[in-house]
Regions:
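ABC family nucleotide-binding domain
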Residues: 5-8, 13-213
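H-loop (His-switch) and adjacent beta-strand-loop-beta switch element
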Residues: 213-222
Length: 222
């Protein structure tokens, strides 16, 4: 009987910056696996390595040692181009600062990950916007929508293409509680549909949306 690989697995991840007296160890031998349909919250004090862990998992930052596995295949040694391709196809990332391109419409912002791979799919854009409650917003520009709506656009961009891994770094940080709950509800629904999710948050009420919570301190799981 063959074991199905985890959508996302981190094996013995360590990450350090600087040299000599400026050397900083951000992560120390961290291992973590996320199942399909599971949302894992990562909590810990400022500087504990939460965002570094998410960046390594999202192939946005290379670990000093260890392996990131996507569906059982190591992605740690991919060059920058291949890492970006893998991220666009398999991983949706949501940040606190939604980073919408102001000169693109909402629909163009959402469809950008597909367009970078040469795919124009207006139906997929419409589905992603409908999923986050922004049906009909395609032709608006970022300056014409609220901060909460902009974060929902960022989520739609992360969801497009049925990605199997969703990573969220303090996605509710600039939002009020009710809007933050709405953001987490959308993330939770996609995870319940089979995606694997990692959520970095400092708010216990938002971590409550997760299936389990991991505490980081000084770059290590407690």
């Amino acid at each position: 009987m063959t074991n199905t690989p985890f959508p996302l697995e981190l094996q013995n991840i360590s990450c350090a910056f600087g040299e000599g007296p400026r050397h900083v160890s951000a992560l120390n031998n961290v291992s973590l696996a996320v199942n399909p349909g599971e949302l894992v919250a990562i909590m810990g004090p400022s500087g504990s390595g939460k965002s570094t862990l998410l960046n390594v998992a999202g192939l946005l930052q290379r670990a000093t040692s260890g392996h990131v596995l996507i569906d059982g295949a190591s992605a740690s040694d991919l060059n920058a181009k291949r890492a970006a391709e893998t991220r666009r196809r398999h991983i949706g990332v949501i940040f606190q600062n939604y980073n919408l391109i102001p000169t693109l419409t909402v629909g163009e912002n959402v469809g950008l990950p597909l367009e970078l791979d040469g795919i124009i799919d207006r139906e997929a854009v419409a589905i992603a916007l409908r999923e986050v409650g922004l049906e009909g917003f395609d032709n608006r520009f970022p300056e014409e929508i609220s901060g909460g709506q902009a974060q929902h656009v960022a989520i739609a961009r992360a969801l497009i293409g049925s990605r199997k891994i969703l990573l969220a770094d303090e996605p509710t940080g600039a939002l009020d509680t009710s809007t933050g709950d709405a953001v987490l509800r959308v993330l939770r629904q996609r995870v319940d549909s089979g995606a694997a999710g990692l959520l970095v948050t400092h708010e216990p009420r938002f971590a409550a949306w997760a299936d389990r919570t991991i505490m980081l301190r000084d770059g290590e799981i407690q």
